């Protein structure tokens, strides 16, 4: 094999957000790590996370309270053992971030020897327990983790490298249930490379790009879920896609999120005529969980035929708004919206994939040597609805847990033998990229219409028929033409879209983020929706 097309490492981490970099930094003391980043390192979802990270730092708060709030938000199908595991390890994992240089906001009267962090409150939380860095927590975390990874001699970050597929050991005459590496598309050189590794970690994020309106960056195309499924891993709860209630409605600002902390600090949701509507839907009003708020906004928009609703914090002092929400204030001013004086136009947008690849408390999947952490995984934490600021927490707790498991096994793990090169001998360069673009837009539009905030059996059946048609076209395309970024993402999004719809079809009730007009009630007993790939 061409030497520059084959790499090897102790641990291959696919994804460079909070989960991937946190794990890489912890295992790099014990072995060589390669981290793959689809685009520039700051392009993932972590960078755009505004709100914060939940952990019990206040004496009036308790781990039990964090557990109970999470279980309530998850609408009865969280895994309580997982919820407890994460809540109990939250403080030490957040402290690891602080020790690594993440500049969480402190109280004004705090001193360096005994820092007191400014804690905010968001929907579903009964106490103030959200640590944050102004309104750009994800950016602060990502920047700190990136700098630490960049300076670590045992970590190599390969930017603009997309994983195509996992390689199982049966490719070299071994165990089909053991992962030994991955085929990777080098977007700079435009060729496929092979990376073999003792352990592979999926930290690829979610799949919200499957929807027309999303708060996520362009890289959120479900790659890890699709690759794990093709390799033989079970997935769960993919019917539960969280729609963030408040994404800015503006032609020049696609996917700009307006953090939940705005409502936590007193912002109201209003109709175009200025009247509030959340008290009509839930006694918690604007502080109700996201699924309830998103559905209320969707209902009011459809009822009134309105393009958007409005988020209004202008009744708060201007200096309070500018201090607590500097990023949002600045961005809105650039767009001609002064949030200290006028309401902000908003719509719901696909935001977070609550289901994913099934893992145990150490992040292990069904395949040996393969781990999944962060949004790509299904741990049981989120149940039918994710509570605000639990996602960054899940990233760092599972990064820690998986890293400990990998570190314990590294001394006895052997490097896989040389792997077969990617075969491009039967394919040609594409002359029909326009076909992919057309299929791409079609998929995102019908997923929004048929698999969106409100569903029916008929809508799900229509979505599945169209997915199968597009899968057939994309399979032919994949068989005949060389790899491209659009082709890889289209193939993966179609796979994940199919799994989402299959999960939704299996759930004969409305629960949390899954709301269907054909089964509007919640069953007395329920559990996760689990899909098993055919061997």
Swiss-Prot record:
Annotated disulfide bonds: none
UniProt-listed GO biological process terms: 'de novo' NAD biosynthetic process from L-aspartate
Site (Important in orienting the L-aspartate substrate): 122
Record's cofactor remark: Binds 1 FAD per subunit.
Gene Ontology CC annotations of this record: cytoplasm
Subcellular compartments: Cytoplasm
Positions annotated as active site in the UniProt record: 290 (proton donor/acceptor)
Catalysed transformations (reactions): L-aspartate + O2 = iminosuccinate + H2O2
Pfam families per record: FAD_binding_2, Succ_DH_flav_C
Pathway named in the protein's UniProt entry: Cofactor biosynthesis; NAD(+) biosynthesis; iminoaspartate from L-aspartate (oxidase route): step 1/1
Cofactor(s) required for function per UniProt: FAD
Family indicated by similarity: Belongs to the FAD-dependent oxidoreductase 2 family. NadB subfamily.
Function according to Swiss-Prot or TrEMBL: Catalyzes the oxidation of L-aspartate to iminoaspartate, the first step in the de novo biosynthesis of NAD(+).
Protein known as: L-aspartate oxidase
Gene designation per UniProt: nadB
């Amino acid at each position: 094999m061409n030497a520059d097309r084959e790499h090897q490492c102790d641990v291959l981490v696919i994804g460079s957000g909070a989960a991937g970099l946190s794990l890489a930094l912890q295992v790099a003391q014990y072995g060589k790590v390669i981290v793959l980043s689809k685009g520039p390192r700051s392009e993932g979802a972590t960078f755009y996370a505004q709100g914060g990270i939940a952990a019990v730092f206040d004496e009036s708060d308790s781990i039990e309270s964090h557990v109970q709030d999470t279980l309530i938000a998850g609408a009865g199908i969280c895994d309580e053992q997982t919820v407890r595991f994460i809540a109990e390890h939250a403080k030490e994992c957040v402290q690891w971030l602080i020790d690594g240089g993440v500049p969480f906001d402190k109280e004004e009267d705090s001193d360096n020897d005994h820092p007191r962090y400014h804690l905010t409150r968001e929907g579903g939380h009964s106490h103030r327990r959200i640590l944050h860095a102004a309104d750009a927590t994800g950016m602060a975390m990502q920047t700190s983790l990136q700098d630490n990874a960049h300076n670590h001699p045992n970590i190599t970050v390969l930017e603009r490298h997309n994983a195509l597929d996992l390689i199982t050991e049966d490719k070299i005459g071994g165990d089909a249930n053991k992962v030994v590496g991955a085929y990777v598309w080098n977007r700079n050189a435009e060729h496929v490379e092979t990376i073999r590794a003792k352990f592979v970690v999926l930290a690829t994020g979610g799949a919200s790009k499957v929807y027309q309106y999303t708060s996520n960056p362009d890289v959120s195309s479900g790659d890890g879920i699709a690759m794990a499924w093709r390799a033989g891993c079970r997935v769960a709860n993919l019917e539960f896609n969280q729609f963030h209630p408040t994404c800015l409605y503006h032609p020049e600002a696609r996917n700009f999120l307006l953090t939940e902390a705005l409502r936590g600090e007193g912002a109201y949701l209003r109709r175009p005529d200025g009247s509030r509507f959340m008290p009509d839907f839930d006694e918690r009003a604007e502080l109700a969980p996201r699924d309830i708020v998103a559905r209320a906004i969707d209902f009011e928009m459809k009822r009134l035929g309105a393009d958007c609703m409005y988020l209004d914090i202008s009744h708060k002092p201007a200096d309070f708004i500018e201090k607590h929400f500097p990023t949002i204030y600045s961005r809105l001013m650039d767009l001609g919206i002064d949030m200290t004086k006028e309401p902000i136009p908003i719509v719901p947008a696909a935001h977070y994939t609550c289901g994913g690849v099934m893992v145990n408390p150490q992040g292990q999947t069904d395949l040996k040597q393969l781990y999944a952490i962060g949004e790509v995984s299904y741990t049981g934490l989120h149940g039918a609805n994710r509570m605000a600021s639990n996602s960054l927490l899940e990233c760092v707790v599972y990064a820690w847990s998986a890293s400990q498991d990998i570190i314990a096994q590294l001394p006895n793990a052997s490097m896989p033998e040389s792997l077969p090169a990617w075969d491009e001998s039967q394919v040609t360069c594409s002359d029909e990229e326009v076909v992919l673009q057309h299929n791409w837009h079609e998929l995102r539009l019908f997923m929004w219409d048929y698999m969106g905030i409100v569903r029916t059996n008929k809508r799900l059946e229509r979505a599945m028929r169209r997915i199968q048609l597009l899968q057939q076209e994309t399979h032919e395309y994949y068989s005949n033409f060389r790899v491209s970024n659009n082709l890889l993402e289209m193939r993966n999004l179609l796979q994940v879209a199919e799994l989402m719809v299959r999960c939704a079809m299996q759930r004969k009730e409305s629960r949390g983020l899954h709301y269907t007009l054909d089964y509007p009630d919640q069953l007395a007993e329920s559990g996760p929706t689990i899909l098993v790939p055919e061997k």
